[in-house]
Regions:
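Structured segments of extracytoplasmic/periplasmic soluble domains
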Residues: 3, 19, 34, 38, ...
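Solvent-exposed, polar/charged alpha-helical surfaces in well-ordered, non-transmembrane soluble domains
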Residues: 14, 33, 37, 101-105, ...
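Flexible, solvent-exposed loop/hinge segments that line or gate ligand/substrate-binding clefts
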Residues: 64-96
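Extracellular/periplasmic bilobal clamshell ligand-binding domains
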Residues: 130-168
């Protein structure tokens, strides 16, 4: 809504609903499995779930399903791909902001970031290598720079818009 306006976003939402291969169900991995099995041609899923599936930690069946799909980063010619964040911060009235800051610095250290990306299959915030499962998808993609603050501000409007579009 913030980037394209309410009218264009609602038209997009209606097209999305009209093109669903099935009623929305399951989690991200269920969407990936639906594509792998031929039930759908395309799905929206967080990239780290494909990493988890490819790692084999979720079982051989999920690994094989993930091998059958291709991940793409949409909107590369436009605004870029939406990126979720896993974040941490210091509350305004934190009783010990100095230690909280030290903890944040620890979380941003190469050692911790390497551990996190190798276990979560997320992309790192600092310049450390991504997991081998994720490296095959590429690192050079355009990210949407919309502030996460906007998501919260626009959330009620987005929910009403998707209700009008017929999302279930």
């Amino acid at each position: 809504i913030a980037k394209n306006g309410e009218q264009a976003t609602e038209a997009w939402g209606k097209s999305l609903v009209k093109n669903l291969a099935r009623k929305p169900q399951g989690n991200d991995r269920a969407q990936i499995i639906a594509v792998a099995s031929g039930e759908a041609d395309i799905a929206v899923a967080n990239s780290y779930y494909i990493g988890i599936m490819l790692s084999g930690t979720a079982g051989e069946e999920q690994r094989e399903a993930a091998k059958k799909v291709q991940m793409i980063f949409p909107n590369q010619q436009g605004k870029g791909t939406h990126v979720n964040i896993s974040g941490a911060g210091i509350l305004k009235y934190a009783p010990n902001p100095n230690n909280a800051n030290l903890f944040l610095e620890f979380l941003l250290s190469d050692k911790v970031q390497k551990h996190m990306v190798s276990k979560s299959y997320e992309y790192p915030i600092v310049n450390v290598a991504v997991s081998k499962e994720m490296s095959g998808f590429g690192l050079d993609f355009k990210e949407d720079n919309t502030s996460v603050k906007v998501y919260g501000e626009m959330n009620p409007d987005a929910i009403r818009l998707m209700d009008r579009a017929g999302w279930k």
